[in-house]
């Protein structure tokens, strides 16, 4: 059923796919079950379409505060190495530094795919997060397999942060939060 749904999206032109296991419990939250499903999808869908990007997954334990046992290492050893694993850092909403990447990459046996929960504001709905984007390590570019931001439900208001996030990922070592924010305001 999963591959059928992905096939329908493929026919519409989608070439990048993600399967999310965040915020679930029970049998579906077990690393071996998740790895098995992702390997199945890779074998029976992704590899049948050479133009499809590697599969991305969000684990149930997507931050260090919620990690425990051998969940992450089980994903890393049982799941195909090309599957990218999302990671939010030490907590749900956090900035990510070099030592954070070293820890998670060792757990997974691969480079993590950063999922920055910013500028999403579902945890502070009375505020719009449009300030400078800062706090992530400027020396982690070689340690990540990808990077995405979780925007607010307000698309236009999210653009300031997303502009800076794109600037950051384009050239991490040279990123300057104040300059990027000023450029975003001028451009948008």
Stretches with model-predicted labels:
Residues 5, 24-178:
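Catalytic-core regions of glycoside hydrolase
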Residues 177-188:
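Catalytic domains of carbohydrate-active enzymes that cleave complex glycans
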Residues 15, 21-23:
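Short, conserved phosphate-binding/catalytic loop or strand-edge motifs used
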Residues 1-15:
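Chitinase-like catalytic core of GlcNAc-active glycosidases
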